[in-house]
Design a protein with these regions (language model features):
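Beta-strand/loop edge motif enriched in small/polar residues
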Residues: 1-190
Length: 190
């Protein structure tokens, strides 16, 4: 399946809380999860996505196309689905390089804003605002390139993990599984 969310600068697509304006808060809803077929570094090459009990990602197709997210705002997402398994603002598992992600803003996420679990999708023009946890989190062999990103952090907002602009792991156990996480971020302001 693919998600096609093709907005414009003057008419962005907005995914937001179902609460009325003024009552919206961090984690009002889960977030967006994309599951692709690109390489990840877990044994067997496939894994269950956090927050998707029946959804799997990973494979051998680095040319995977999981859709288009252009001129998109994701507001008030990010929930703990289970202990240590959260839904982020935008969760990408094994998403390949033919996926188009450009001009995406995530605001007031109750967990990470963007998290990549493997895959090799490239993305440009990413903005985070007031994220509770990490702004950009890379795991499981993610090897994409991110260019033009801005993270605006609230100085008094953080979850119990400490929250950072970046978190990058090869995997949760610190293995040397291949492909190793090797994301490239350029033109970033924190």
């Amino acid at each position: 399946a693919k998600l096609i969310a093709q907005g414009t600068a003057s008419e962005p697509i907005v995914f937001t809380s179902n609460q009325s304006a003024g009552s919206r808060n961090y984690g009002d809803w889960g977030g967006i999860i994309l599951c692709g077929d690109a390489k990840i570094n877990v044994p067997g090459g496939e894994a269950q996505i956090e927050g998707g009990p029946r959804s799997y990602y990973g494979g051998t197709n680095d040319n995977d196309n999981s859709g288009i997210l252009n001129y998109v705002r994701i507001e008030f997402p990010g929930i703990p689905f289970q202990p240590d398994k959260e839904i982020n603002g935008l969760t990408m598992g094994g998403v390949g390089k033919n996926t188009n992600i450009d001009y995406v803003q995530i605001s007031y996420s109750g967990d990470d804003a963007f998290e990549w679990f493997g895959g090799c999708v490239n993305a440009k023009h990413l903005i985070t605002l007031g994220t509770w946890d990490d702004d950009f989190d890379t795991d499981y062999g993610f090897s994409g390139m991110i260019q033009y990103a801005v993270a605006l952090r609230e100085p008094n907002i953080a979850d119990v993990s400490g929250s950072n602009a970046f978190e990058s792991d090869n995997d949760a156990s610190g293995s040397t599984n291949l492909p190793q996480t090797s994301a490239v971020f350029s033109n970033v302001s924190i």
